[in-house]
């Protein structure tokens, strides 16, 4: 009887254990299945990472290659050439409006909005992540675990790491900025966005870039971008995509949030913190030397009194906008003295509590294989160059002891609506008229005069060579003053052409 009771008790306990363990096993299997569904689902996404993040800017089919216009005493030839620009930046500029979508560990979609620097955030329940900061001296204290990696929680964790460095290590470790520099002339919105990897609207709004005036050749603009990086914060890359998601999340949940072959998931792997300085150099000069003049100024070449670039600088202004760093430097600086811009760039280039860092760029990776998500920009643009020509004149002077005749001819250039050059031939009304010493006259030339031909001949009185050339010049350059002089005797004539 006792043995029977023991057997019954053991059987009851075994049955209870089976009933208790069954939900645990089922729950564990459910979690594993959900994780596997995420890993296999993301792994099975079919996309070309170069195509899914392709940015096709302007496509130019036709344009007028040349145009000529008169402006006062000048003739301006505008020459246009089609260019193509292809870039694949991996660090994407951060603007204020996307801070909460571009923090370390943030999940995004690789869609059109990402290409346009307006990333779509993938909002689902998350597992904890580790973030790391590269401030010197922290060593083993450079990492922190964030249980619920939202924008607010991650930002708070970064502040905690930075505060720790300021309290413990800032006195023994200096932190000069790592500077990245890029520059480009402005030709179009798509071109400058691709060249500097920045949203053109930022430049338009903060610097006041007038793209219409640039397109109409009314202004020439160069943009400088200085990225001064104080530190970088990175998120640990997952071994499997499911490592990032709460156990309750399934691949179907991700699909409902927008994950697809056309919009595969990404994670922000690192964010650079520091300050960005955008500088606009703008001029109303139409000189072909504008870019060279601006570059000389940037290099701090001593050219303030340069006659070569004087007109350009007198008609130029400079604007700087600082994002990050000391709040006193945030205001827009507009000046005609580039030394003030240099001061803005030089000041506050070291991280401190009074000169805090600001998120300036980020890099994302595809969850499928942790490969870097690079936006592939391709755009056409028109590069415009202008050449100014001024009016000139020919000063004829004859003091020789002989009868002389002159021939002066030139072409005046214009362009038709297709941009083709049209030449109108012109001649001086005094051509081949006998002139005796002393004779002088002035022949005015329009600024669009080309192919200038000057000939002078003397009457020798010799039957076998009645006329002898004293001057015979083709393609005489147009200058303010073309001084043509002839002198001497019939046997020993003299001549010169000088320019000033």
From Swiss-Prot:
Note the topology in the membrane.
Multi-pass membrane protein
The protein's location, in the record's own words, is: Secreted; Host cell membrane
- List cellular component terms (GO): extracellular region; host cell plasma membrane; membrane
Q: Where does the signal peptide begin and end?
A: 1-28
Q: Where is this motif: Conserved undecapeptide?
A: 458-468
**Keywords in UniProt for this one?**
Cytolysis, Hemolysis, Host cell membrane, Host membrane, Lipid-binding, Membrane, Secreted, Signal, Toxin, Transmembrane, Transmembrane beta strand, Virulence
Q: Does the keyword Signal apply?
A: yes
The source's domain of life comes to Bacteria
Give a yes or no for keyword Signal in this entry. yes
- Which SUPFAM superfamilies does this UniProt record tie to the protein? Perfringolysin (SSF56978)
For this protein, the record's InterPro entries field holds: Thiol_cytolys_C (IPR035390), Thiol_cytolys_C_sf (IPR038700), Thiol_cytolysin (IPR001869), Thiol_cytolysin_ab_sf (IPR036363), Thiol_cytolysin_sf (IPR036359)
TM spans, by residue? 189-202, 209-218, 287-296, 304-316
Q: Which GO terms describe its molecular function?
A: cholesterol binding; toxin activity
As annotated in the record, motif Cholesterol binding runs over 490-491
Which family does this protein fall into? Belongs to the cholesterol-dependent cytolysin family.
State whether it acts alone or in a complex, and with which partners, per the record: Homooligomeric pore complex of 35 to 50 subunits; when inserted in the host membrane.
Annotated protein name in UniProt: Perfringolysin O
Q: What species is given as this protein's source? A: Clostridium perfringens (strain ATCC 13124 / DSM 756 / JCM 1290 / NCIMB 6125 / NCTC 8237 / Type A)
Gene responsible for this protein: pfo
